Amino acid sequence: MIASLSVEAERELIDAANYYAEHAGPDLGLAFIAEFERALAVLCDHPHLGPVWRGKSRRFPLRRFPYSVIYRLRIDELYVVALAHQRRRPT
């Protein structure tokens, strides 16, 4: 299964990685991206792992960071809708 990101999810990923890099050092920004990539690899291998959340979307929390991958399953595609902070309300 392949993964793709919405424009919004890509922006959220970059913004969060930049925030960690600026406030805690570049290594943490890179660690955030690596954790996101690890989560995508797990989800591509096991797409039903995340529980259903808000209709047809699914939610999978990152291990080391307070973010969740919000995604939808399409035919042979895992589409990332958002990268949501777990303590903020979605807009």
Q: What are the residue ranges of the model-derived segments?
A:
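Basic, Lys/Arg-enriched alpha-helical interface segments
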Residues: M1-S57, R74-E77
